[in-house]
A protein has these predicted regions:
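GH16 jelly-roll
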Residues: 1-140
């Protein structure tokens, strides 16, 4: 029951944000972002504005914005690994922890792997005003 409500809510937000985002400028990846780790697993696509990041046996990949943003639009198309994925966490998150190490804000979308035959689980975390001890965590 809650899974369906969550998916309807998420879909509604995506549709709303998608409609509002059509007039926003898009920054080229090289102009607005820097690689954090896993350079071999990060490929800039032909349009120069999108990237394909991947996960192999040793590492994933990540990048960070070169500027601060007070608001904006973001999206991700995530394909999760198949088969046995226990211990694998695929995450899409935003944080200002590089600027505020002891008092940061964070929004996480984490996909938690599982044993063969079991579904992936999604976990969301929201921390505000440095409340890393008292955040909002939901698991579906």
């Amino acid at each position: 029951k809650y899974h369906v409500l969550f998916l309807i809510y998420l879909f509604s937000i995506i549709v709303l944000v998608n409609g509002l985002s059509r007039n926003l400028p898009i920054v080229a990846f090289d102009e607005g972002y820097s690689h954090l780790f896993g350079d071999n697993n990060l490929m800039i696509l032909k349009d120069g504005k999108s990237v394909h990041i991947s996960l192999d046996e040793r590492t994933g990949s990540g990048f960070v914005s070169q500027d601060l943003y007070l608001h904006g639009y973001f999206s991700a198309s995530i394909k999760l690994p198949a088969d046995y994925t226990a211990g694998v966490v695929v995450a899409f998150y935003m944080s200002n922890g590089d600027m505020f190490e002891k008092n940061h804000d964070e929004i996480d979308f984490e996909f938690l792997g599982n044993i063969r035959g079991k579904d992936w689980r999604i976990q969301t975390n929201i921390y505000g005003n440095g409340s890393t001890n008292v955040g909002r965590e939901e698991r579906y």
